[in-house]
From Swiss-Prot:
InterPro entries: PCSK9_ProteinaseK-like, Peptidase_S8/S53_dom, Peptidase_S8/S53_dom_sf, Peptidase_S8_Ser-AS, Peptidase_S8_subtilisin-like, Peptidase_S8_subtilisin-rel, S8pro/Inhibitor_I9, S8pro/Inhibitor_I9_sf
SUPFAM superfamilies for the chain: Protease propeptides/inhibitors (SSF54897), Subtilisin-like (SSF52743)
Signal sequence annotation: 1-19
Ranges for domain Inhibitor I9: 35-116
Job of this protein: Secreted subtilisin-like serine protease with keratinolytic activity that contributes to pathogenicity.
Localization per record: Secreted
GO molecular function: serine-type endopeptidase activity
Organism lineage string: Eukaryota, Fungi, Dikarya, Ascomycota, Pezizomycotina
Official protein name in the record: Subtilisin-like protease 3
GN (gene name): SUB3
Alphabetized PROSITE patterns for the sequence: SUBTILASE, SUBTILASE_SER
Amino acid sequence: MGCIKVISVFLAAIAAVDARAFFHNRGGSDVIPNSYIVVMKDGVTTEDFDSHISTVAATHNLNKAKRGSEAVGHKDSFNINGWRAYNGHFDEATIESILNDDKVNYVEHDRVVKLAALVTQPNAPTWGLGRVSHRAPGNRDFVYDSSAGQGITIYGVDTGIDIRHPEFAGRIRWGTNTVDNDNTDGNGHGTHTAGTFAGTTYGVAKKANIVAVKVLSAGGSGSTAGVIKGIDWCVTDVRSRNALGKAALNLSLGGSFSQANNDAVTRAQEAGIFVAVAAGNDNRDARNYSPASAPAVCTAASSTIDDQKSSFSNWGSIVDIYAPGSSILSAAPGGGTRTLSGTSMASPHVCGVGAAMLAQGVSVAQVCNRLKQIGNAVIRNPGTSTTNRLLYNGSGQ
């Protein structure tokens, strides 16, 4: 009998240890102090989630009174295709309490997220559109299916978009802003990427609808939590419009590895939205960056006009496809144009071709695989364990 009691106590102790959530990826120079993302276990009900938030609020207020903390507590809640999470500013004692809740899967620091663009090169030629519609290099004609993404909506998760730019006339609306109160593109990056994925002149999917989702400031930075909040809004908006299977997200941004960021884009993809992301610009393995390292989404590395890997482009086995990213001419706020380089410029090429495929009846789940199947095996020195496939739209040219 005594032995049974000992075993019972031992098993209870194991269960208690297993119940504790883990803290994912502590530390780093990009951590936002005292700001955290808390991810719940799968299957947590709305009632359990609300109860947890209430308990956390009470614990936070108690610890705040004890220690004189200025942390603001819970901020935003997320529900992306059943993936429940929230963010907030908490002291260490409150985080310890959260980690001990058996409904919590993991906690991670909120981190700075930045653009994946590099340099401006004035008066550079437009070459990317011609390249993605021809097997051989050097042709400037853009050949594409006449549907051109019609009926598909692309969400530009970025610095905002100049919705008055002629490139987007009659096809664009403002969506949401998770970073500030300025519903403009004070940086220009988001307008440029939108011009590439769906601009009338510089775009791939010239008839697609566009939604501006601002998650990065005019300075080009934001937070993981702000990006997740933007993705959450996108999924909710797509559902409300009965547009699953007819929508795409472009994320020309990134930061250090974040499981929460990866989970968010994965759930968006699984919900029925094609997601294209930038590989990053550090000439390193993209598996160490997010959302580039999420296996479920389509990760784009950058190529040059000579079909070389761009010197800055991240690489690695997580990369799905190369696309034009060096010296890309596209739209700029105020009705003009500018030339930028980066994997930020590669991703919207992929997003635009993906949107065009959706318009032709290819399913969300099939798009990235289809791009890899028909891509041109032409990239020289693509990087260790990296595909040499260059984006191609299947025009037959």
